[in-house]
């Protein structure tokens, strides 16, 4: 399974990513081994996920979410 996810960082910012193993990726982010963007904003909290069978579909969705404004991402989080 392929997952697109949103993390809420300690400073309130949102980070969007893609993975095949949510648990391992969240642990990597919180241990400082994740994306550079999240390393200085620890801890992070998983606030939203979408699951896809197809990797291409997940990457396409990640691309679209990354281009959303903060307010649009907050609405997306609130919709689930």
Name the predicted role of every residue range.
Residues 1-80:
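GIY-YIG nuclease catalytic motif and its immediate N-terminal context
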